[in-house]
């Protein structure tokens, strides 16, 4: 199974002078900047060309339920000519909340978009029934790094189960596209490659630029499963002037201050 990890295009929070969960000016569920919109159009064109080159290839597109990812995944799905399926567990660390983590007062949690709201605003997307009332429990406020690592670990288990099912013929073979977030992708890759997963200062990071594409191969072999990187942080579809994100310092702060934009 081939897995394509796509980070969302530049969000309004990404463009803040000081992006992070500690910034009171952050939005709980931001949209995209003009640069981000240009990035999604570049993604759409890239995947449209890929579809034209391999018209018989089967693909699946999965998306985080956060607005910046839905805007990005809609372009990915349009380019590939398929519908987008939404999974609540693909959201970014922190969840859906307003206010600054570590500021005065506790963060105020929100439910996030409901199934009806998502499918009305993003007609190409299909949201599951368990999102009838949203995807985030407001009582949780802001998700911790430890909780995010546990959640992403279960996503990794899901990906391996899909790879095995495709290998065994229990599920149609397809290339899997997941549109998610910078810190989510870092945690996922660390889990896949058995890198140390800690809180606070990190010894290593997998940094993703906005609207980048990673490609991995999940191999189910008789002597055991193996996953390998084939493409890392590909942004060749983006003109230099519209590239953004992916700094080491930015992702490092996401751990040391518990949160990213």
Task: State where each predicted segment sits.
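Acidic, low-complexity terminal tails and accessory targeting/binding regions
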Residues: 1-3, 92-120, 165-174, 190-261
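GST superfamily/GST-like fold recognition
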Residues: 182-186
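Short glycine/proline- and acidic residue-enriched helix-loop micro-motifs
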Residues: 101-103, 117-147, 256
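Short beta-strand scaffold positions
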Residues: 63-64, 150, 179-180
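Phosphate-coordination/substrate-recognition cap region in phosphate-metabolizing enzymes
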Residues: 41-128, 206
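Glycine-rich phosphate-binding loop signature in dinucleotide/nucleotide-binding domains
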Residues: 50-57, 159-175
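An N-terminal RHG(E/S)-centered segment typical of histidine phosphatases
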Residues: 1-58, 74-81, 220-261
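Short acidic/His/Gly/Ser-rich catalytic and metal-binding motifs that mark active-site loops
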Residues: 11-18, 94-96, 128-130
């Amino acid at each position: 199974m081939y897995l394509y990890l796509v980070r969302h295009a530049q969000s309004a929070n990404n463009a803040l002078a000081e992006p992070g969960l500690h910034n009171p000016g952050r939005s709980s569920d931001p949209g995209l900047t003009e640069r981000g919109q240009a990035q999604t159009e570049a993604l759409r064109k890239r995947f449209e060309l890929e579809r034209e080159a391999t018209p018989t290839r089967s693909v699946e597109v999965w998306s985080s339920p956060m607005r910046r990812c839905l805007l990005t995944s809609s372009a990915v799905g349009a380019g590939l000519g398929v519908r987008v399926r939404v999974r609540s567990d693909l959201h970014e660390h922190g969840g859906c909340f307003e206010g600054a983590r570590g500021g005065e007062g506790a963060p105020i949690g929100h439910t996030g978009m409901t199934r009806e709201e998502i499918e009305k605003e993003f007609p190409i997307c299909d949201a599951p029934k368990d999102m009838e009332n949203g995807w985030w429990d407001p009582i949780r406020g802001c998700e911790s790094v430890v909780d995010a690592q546990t959640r992403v670990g279960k996503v990794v288990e899901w990906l391996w189960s899909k790879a095995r099912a495709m290998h065994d013929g229990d599920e149609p073979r397809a290339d899997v596209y997941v549109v998610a977030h910078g810190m989510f992708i870092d945690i996922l890759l660390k889990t896949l490659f058995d890198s140390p997963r800690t809180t606070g200062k990190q010894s290593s990071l997998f940094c993703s630029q906005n609207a980048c594409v990673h490609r991995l191969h999940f191999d189910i072999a008789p002597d055991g499963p193996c996953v390998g990187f084939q493409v890392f942080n590909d942004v060749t579809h983006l003109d230099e002037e519209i590239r953004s994100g992916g700094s080491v310092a930015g992702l490092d702060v996401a751990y040391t201050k518990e949160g990213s934009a």
